[in-house]
Amino acid sequence: FFGRVDFIYEGEDEPEIFYIGIGNFAEKAGHIPLVYDWRAPVSGLFYDYDKGPASYEAPMGEIHGEVASKWQYKIRNGKMIYEFESDVKIDDDILKAELGSNGEVQLKNIIRTIQKEQNAIIRNTKDRILVIQGAAGSGKTSVALHRIAYLLYHDRQNLKSSNILILSPNGVFSDYISHILPELGEENIQEMSFDLFAYRKLQDTAADCEDRCDQIEREMRDPCLLYTSPSPRD
């Protein structure tokens, strides 16, 4: 686990403690939850609230109460790296360390550092079409992948990994993100470039599709083409 929320239900005096982790973990005998998946409804308390009034959506309706305290942990190889009570938000130094540098070979999962605004996007189940805009390095890809993991968790009966396709710019990008969903306990999903996707959809039509390599060679032969808008081809 990496987080903990002490939550006092409305009308109660003593808090119930919820530990938040990468997946659900329960007692073998009584099936009593010991750790809750970061995507579980109650885990939203960890990402959305500081100390004070709070609520979360449960199958039986909205649950109201108060966050008494919130803790963050990092445990590696059975050793506690850090442990602290957070009554504001994730500390900037911790956030920077978790996100790593821009030179990372592979993208990191962000379940320890998801911010309130990101969590709202990840857990949005009302909008069928969702556009995420932001500058380079702002976390769009991370949020999108964690949203996929959330949707697969939230609607397992109707949504499978095989129903989802990522259009990636190239193979390097595909390798960069390929480990995230397995890390989050989900099967990997299909990824392909838009060129390949278009080719597969159009290969049986009468259209003559120019592949990317041919396009680059043509433009290199005539540099003027790089600065003019493409015209319709027969």
Annotated model-derived regions:
Residues 115-123:
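Pre-Walker A adenine-sensing motif
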Residues 139:
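Conserved glycine(s) of the Walker
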Residues 136:
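The conserved Walker
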Residues 1-97:
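N-terminal accessory nucleic-acid engagement/regulatory domains that precede
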Residues 102-115:
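N-terminal pre-Walker A segment at the start of P-loop NTPase domains
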Residues 132:
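Hydrophobic anchor at the beta1->P-loop junction of P-loop NTPases
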Residues 143:
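Hydrophobic positions on the alpha1 helix immediately C-terminal to the Walker A/P-loop
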Residues 152-229, 233:
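Alpha-helical nucleic-acid-binding subdomain
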